[in-house]
């Protein structure tokens, strides 16, 4: 067994010392290509590979690197929220409606209704109850339920206490309470 076959040295496998010196001094194509070459078996294949590698180097240096593709996906959260808030202004104002004793919630659009009377009729048909007529003195007369709403400040008020436009802008959610629970919210309830 030869000593050269079992010798441990630093360098690329399968390359002789002469080839390694060529690589270090820059006379080899391998340095320009940044890829390891397999050892060639014949002179003819070596010359063919050098020609193709030289052509490849010329082509790659003259061509511009490929442009990065634009990443397509969700927009940043801030833009998404801005757009959704803008669309909400154009669309409806949806609020949740709950009723004491009912195991479900509903959601309604306040912009669909033109005033309190239309809203109350819709709530009566939605929950199959009678709310009665609202008066500032007596509240909701003739009903065991009183419609209330939570405003921007978190206060619960009777539906009908403020003008309709102010109600639409300040209402966060609606709740149809029992009349006994709504006693402290308005006059004569």
Swiss-Prot record:
PROSITE patterns, sorted: PB1
GO BP terms: auxin-activated signaling pathway; regulation of DNA-templated transcription
Keyword presence, Nucleus: yes
Pfam families assigned: AUX_IAA (PF02309)
Locations listed in the record: Nucleus
Expression triggers: By auxin.
Key words, A-Z: Auxin signaling pathway, Nucleus, Phosphoprotein, Repressor, Transcription, Transcription regulation
InterPro entries to which the protein is assigned, alphabetical: AUX/IAA_dom, AUX_IAA, PB1-like
GO CC terms, sorted: nucleus
UniProt PTM comment: Phosphorylated by phytochrome A in vitro.
Renumbered ranges of motif EAR-like (transcriptional repression): 8-12
Domain PB1: 92-179
Signal sequence coordinates: none
Principal location: nucleus
Subunit comment: Homodimers and heterodimers.
Domain remarks: The N-terminal half of the protein contains two conserved domains I and II. Domain I includes a slightly degenerated ERF-associated amphiphilic repression (EAR) motif which seems to be involved in the activity of transcriptional repression. Domain II is required for the correct degradation of the protein through the SCF-mediated ubiquitin-proteasome pathway. Interactions between Aux/IAA proteins and auxin response factors (ARFs) occur through their C-terminal dimerization domains III and IV.
UniProt function note: Aux/IAA proteins are short-lived transcriptional factors that function as repressors of early auxin response genes at low auxin concentrations. Repression is thought to result from the interaction with auxin response factors (ARFs), proteins that bind to the auxin-responsive promoter element (AuxRE). Formation of heterodimers with ARF proteins may alter their ability to modulate early auxin response genes expression.
Sequence similarity: Belongs to the Aux/IAA family.
Protein name stated in the entry: Auxin-induced protein IAA4
Organism listed in the record: Pisum sativum
